[in-house]
């Protein structure tokens, strides 16, 4: 059942913001003063219980869209490469690879004796089928453009060539060749993305697009899908046919759907979870004092943002109005007093830490807040709004205390600086996705983007006109041209310059409002072993184990 929409009258927002700031002051601390985990029960060393955020939208590798979906898929499927503990690509289904002298051909050698979870032999052609399916317009994958560097991929996505002409071939059962338009320095990281997973052709032939369900899904990962209890959890069990099964320590993993961080925290303290998806802001101070050894915080290549619906008023063809709203968001105050978990104020789109790239910023980033307000008021009036005729706008976001606090705070900033009247509308995550994609009701919406691989192109691509997850509908031919040139650019310095120019251009257009850069935040029980923090925040369950407290 969808969550009841939350509507807040604009007149109450300043008072609500004050309440938010006061609540953040004491952290909403639990009464217990113990220094370690409480609620401990006997440890089941064979079953890991992971908090996993909102319920996944799909477990189909080529169709899934959300972070919570990809977390599960990484346990059910394995690509040619995987992500190592340091966030860098490592060998996975492919035991080795070679790269041509010109950087345009990668030849992957599969491990000997690979099998699907049902025992069928896994061959190189299964990777060809999976990647052809990814770019096939009939699949309607929102990640189709991720293979754009591959020969003919862009033309196939546009429907101009058949999927059979994709530059991925299997000359024999253990060799996958990926041919590129031009060198792509991030290709190995891209091959670790779940959307490039192999496809089990008999399952597709038998079940069609409904193959990714319990009792039907055949994967090649360390685990097999066992159950999906809607509104509760997804259960997976160990796959004895996985090539590295002897090193898998867990028999089962349960991924619990956790929409609200505070609820998830209560489950963790009660001993119902071993790992949390996030950490609640209102209890953060208490957690730092009492659960410091269980708290993991690490930089992450991810951006929290508000998107504008550019297909309809009031933001269609109104870059000045969009800029005005961005100018008056006090990101420093927001991250220190409202979120308070170490997030970094975002004055650009690409986070710090991306390899071989200098993140760009809004041109107003050096200005004082008072200077920003003066410019914003002039832009607001130029767009036709005033105290007598205020902008009335709605922010949509998925349910959760943290998202609500942020929306309340931003609405208060807009009201105080410009007189904007804002209504807030909270809905269940999948309902929010549907609202955004329909583009008939949303005006401003909350979203986030996690880099699929350690390269600025992973962020730049999201704003490309025809990219499947371009939620704002942003379309600038110059921006698209810069990205198209970057894709085929062999000179790394020139490629970097093109991507940096593209980011500056996009920021000037203001199709979205970057608010902060994430840090990954997890609570992890002392009896969980093998966890490695990294900038892409990827942890495979096969690398984890349970035992006595560390």
Positions of PLM-derived features:
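Ligand/substrate-recognition segments at binding pockets and active sites
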Residues: 28, 230, 373, 377-451, ...
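Extracellular/periplasmic solute-recognition and catalytic clefts
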Residues: 29-30, 226-237, 254-312, 336-337
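Extracytoplasmic/peripheral linker and loop segments enriched in polar/acidic and small residues
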Residues: 41, 168-169, 335, 370, ...
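N-terminal lobe/hinge region of extracytoplasmic solute-binding protein
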Residues: 51-101, 139, 216-220
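Aromatic- and charge-enriched surface segment that lines or borders ligand/interaction sites
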Residues: 95-146, 177, 267, 315-317
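Gly/Pro-rich hinge or "lid" segments in bacterial periplasmic/extracellular proteins
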Residues: 151, 159-165, 169, 174, ...
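Structural transition elements
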Residues: 345-382, 400-405
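Long beta-strand-rich cores associated with HINT superfamily self-processing modules
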Residues: 522-550
């Amino acid at each position: 059942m969808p969550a009841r929409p939350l509507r807040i009258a604009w007149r109450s927002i300043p008072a609500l913001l004050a309440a938010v700031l006061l609540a953040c002051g004491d952290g909403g601390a639990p009464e217990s003063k113990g220094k370690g985990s409480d609620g401990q029960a006997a440890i089941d060393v064979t079953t890991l219980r992971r908090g996993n955020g909102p319920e996944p939208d799909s477990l189909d590798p080529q169709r899934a869209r959300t972070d919570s979906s990809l977390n599960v898929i990484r346990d059910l499927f394995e690509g040619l490469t995987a992500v190592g503990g340091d966030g860098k690509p490592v060998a996975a289904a492919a035991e080795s690879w070679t790269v041509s002298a010109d950087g345009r051909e990668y030849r992957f050698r599969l491990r000997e004796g690979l099998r699907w979870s049902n025992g069928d032999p896994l061959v190189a052609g299964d990777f060809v089928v999976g990647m052809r399916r990814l770019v096939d317009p009939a699949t309607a994958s929102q990640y189709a453009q991720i293979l754009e560097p591959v020969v003919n991929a862009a033309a196939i996505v546009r429907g101009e060539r058949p999927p059979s002409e994709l530059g991925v071939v299997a000359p024999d059962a253990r060799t996958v060749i990926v041919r590129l338009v031009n060198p792509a320095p991030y290709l190995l990281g891209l091959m670790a993305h779940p959307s490039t997973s192999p496809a089990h052709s008999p399952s597709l032939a038998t079940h069609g697009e409904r193959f990714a369900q319990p009792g039907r899904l055949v994967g090649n990962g360390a685990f097999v899908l066992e159950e999906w209890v809607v509104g509760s959890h997804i259960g997976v069990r160990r796959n004895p046919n996985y090539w590295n099964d002897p090193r898998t320590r867990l028999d089962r993993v349960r991924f619990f759907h956790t929409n609200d961080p505070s609820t998830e925290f209560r489950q963790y303290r009660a001993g119902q979870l071993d790992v949390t998806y996030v950490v609640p802001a209102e209890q953060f101070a208490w957690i730092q004092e009492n659960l410091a050894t269980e708290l993991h915080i690490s930089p992450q290549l991810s951006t929290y943002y508000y998107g504008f619906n550019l297909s309809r008023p009031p933001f269609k063809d109104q870059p000045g109005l969009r800029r005005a709203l961005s100018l008056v968001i006090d990101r420093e105050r927001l991250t220190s007093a409202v979120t308070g978990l170490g997030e970094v104020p975002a004055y650009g789109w690409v986070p710090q830490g991306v390899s071989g790239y200098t993140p760009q910023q809004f041109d107003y980033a050096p200005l004082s807040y008072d200077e920003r307000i003066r410019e914003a008021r002039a832009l607001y009036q130029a767009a036709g709004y005033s105290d007598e005729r205020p902008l009335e706008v709605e922010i949509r976001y998925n349910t959760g205390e943290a998202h609500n606090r942020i929306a309340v705070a931003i609405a208060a900033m807009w009201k105080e600086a410009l007189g904007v009247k804002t209504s807030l509308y909270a809905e269940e995550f999948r309902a929010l996705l549907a609202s955004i994609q329909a583009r008939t009701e949303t005006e401003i919406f909350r979203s986030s983007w996690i880099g699929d691989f350690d390269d600025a192109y992973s962020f730049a691509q999201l704003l490309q006109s025809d990219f499947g997850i371009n939620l704002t509908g942003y379309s600038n031919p110059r921006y698209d041209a810069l990205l198209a040139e970057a894709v085929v650019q062999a000179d790394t310095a020139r490629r970097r310059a093109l991507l940096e120019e593209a980011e500056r251009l996009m920021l000037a257009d203001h199709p979205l409002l970057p608010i902060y850069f994430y840090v990954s935040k997890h609570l992890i029980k002392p009896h969980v072993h093998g966890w490695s923090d990294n900038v892409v925040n990827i942890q495979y369950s096969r690398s984890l184990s349970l035992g006595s407290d560390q």
